[in-house]
Amino acid sequence: MSYVIKETTCQQAFAALNDCNSAVIDVRCPEEYALYGPIPGAHLIPWKMIRDDMLVDNAHFGCDLEKVVSYRKDTGYFHLYFICGSGNRSCEAAECALDILRDGRCEVYNVVGGMDEWVCAGLPTTPAALLG
């Protein structure tokens, strides 16, 4: 196992949505979902939250991430793909994941370009109007 964050493309992350040994973690804050909507099949675990017009840490990030990981314990080995709006916060979240998941059961990836690249590539999102 690797204890470094690997960079990957949105196309590779999209392919991972169909892999039972992988999970895509969307770390955008809920307010950002209105821009592009979430990725169907991704786990929505915000890295930061907007409070009083400021970005603050999501106190539940680690716990929510561990829930996704514990769901995959039976596979023994899996891949986590982190995505945000542009690829910066997802890299921070991926670093945190490496700190949390020190047992060597997963590879951690940052999706370069984030949702900006995802949308440019024509990959699917759920329109925000359908989230109601």
Regions found by a protein language model. Give the residues of each.
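Rhodanese-like catalytic fold shared by cysteine-dependent sulfurtransferases
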Residues: 1-23, 30-81, 88-132
